[in-house]
């Protein structure tokens, strides 16, 4: 069970090393929620492109040993797992950011068999492995930017 009101999310950005139409893609979220699910609004990535995500959040109480467990699914099938340590967080901190990956870039596969839908499920845990928040998002990998750019 998630302990409410300790972590609240503020923003979500997908950042690209190169992308026609801008390097940043901001996705609207419900500010103040500790359970964000953007899986019904996937963004698009060209195969082979480098990207990372940035999640803005705030903490209302101190958090010890904050970690983020990241589960990747491809078409609902488990595809990979990662854990990223964040560390200790002070109470009443408003301008925190979580970058994934922490260093460098992720790269979308260029193999045709890897094109398609992906879902990332992030579980934020701290204070003795207590569930604090969840953040889910999805994206599609396409063979070229023409098919990858969002339709507005």
From Swiss-Prot:
| SUPFAM superfamilies membership | E set domains
Subcellular location(s): the record lists: Cytoplasm
What family does the entry list?
Answer: Belongs to the Rho GDI family.
Task: Name a single GO biological process.
Answer: regulation of Rho protein signal transduction
The chain's disulfide connectivity reads none
| Listed name of the protein | Putative rho GDP-dissociation inhibitor 2
Primary residence: cytoplasm
Q: Mind telling me which GO cellular component terms the entry cites?
A: cytosol; membrane
Q: Which InterPro entries match?
A: Ig_E-set (IPR014756), RhoGDI_dom_sf (IPR024792)
Any GO molecular function? Rho GDP-dissociation inhibitor activity
Q: Which organism is it from?
A: Dictyostelium discoideum (Social amoeba)
Q: What does this protein do?
A: Regulates the GDP/GTP exchange reaction of the Rho proteins by inhibiting the dissociation of GDP from them, and the subsequent binding of GTP to them.
Keywords of the record: Cytoplasm, GTPase activation
Among Gene3D superfamilies, the record links this protein to: Coagulation Factor XIII, subunit A, domain 1
């Amino acid at each position: 069970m998630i302990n409410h009101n300790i972590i609240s999310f503020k923003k979500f950005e997908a950042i690209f090393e190169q992308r026609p139409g801008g390097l940043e893609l901001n996705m609207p979220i419900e500010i103040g929620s500790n359970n964000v699910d953007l899986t019904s609004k996937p963004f698009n990535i060209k195969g082979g492109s480098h990207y990372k995500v940035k999640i803005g959040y705030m903490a209302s109480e101190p958090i010890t040993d904050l970690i983020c467990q990241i589960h990747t699914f491809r078409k609902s099938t488990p595809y990979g797992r990662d854990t990223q340590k964040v560390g200790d967080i002070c109470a009443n901190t408003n301008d925190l950011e979580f970058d994934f990956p922490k260093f460098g870039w992720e790269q979308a596969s260029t193999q045709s068999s890897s094109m398609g839908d992906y879902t990332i499920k992030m579980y934020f845990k701290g204070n003795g492995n207590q569930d604090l928040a969840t953040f889910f998002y999805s994206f599609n990998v396409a063979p070229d930017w023409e098919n990858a750019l969002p339709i507005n």
